[in-house]
Amino acid sequence: MLCLGEAFLQGFDSLCWNYAVDQHMAVDLQSDTIRRLRSLTARYGTALLTGYIEMDRDRIYSSCAVFESGRTVHNYRRISRGWKEYTKTDRHYCEGTVTGEFTLRGQRIMIALCGDLWDYPERFRKEHLLIWPVYVNYTPEDWNNGVLDDYAGQALTAGRDTLMVNPLDTDPVSHGGAFRFQNGPVTCRIPFDREDVLIVDTEQADR
């Protein structure tokens, strides 16, 4: 499965917090954009996990969808409110209320989006694999001087095997990075500011 970061599809700063504008940026699960993504998973035989800005009727969410073999396997909506400028937003900008696992090729997986794992770690405490798409703008110096250790520690509050994905971006600058935390420490990673794919074997995550 190819895993991408939070709000990767449109970009984390794609919203202006004016619903009349933002409703055209968000996409629903039946949109042509999502249909194309689903079709790619069937064409290439690879599942895809991506963060996106979701439209559901008249409500907008920061969501994360999983596609495999041309179908939607799972759609998770962020439960913490830090994705939005909540002093500017109205009832149209919403959070999800449900966490839960899904099964992909025999493996149980959960998703937490960025601040979810900081605000509600108790809702993600499972023994199986956790995928944690984020969007954060720390400098490499900050990451290397304690921030990465903080994220590793927070991942451990939820589970013993976590994959964290942070997208590269130029405006605002995000230095990217992908990491695997196992029982606390980082066991493999992509360096900051490098466009690359971190390949991990998660067959043991459920054992």
What is each model feature region?
Residues 26-47, 118-197:
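CN hydrolase (nitrilase-like) catalytic-core segments centered on the catalytic cysteine
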Residues 20-22, 65-69, 149, 180-181:
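Short, hinge-like loop/turn segments at secondary-structure boundaries
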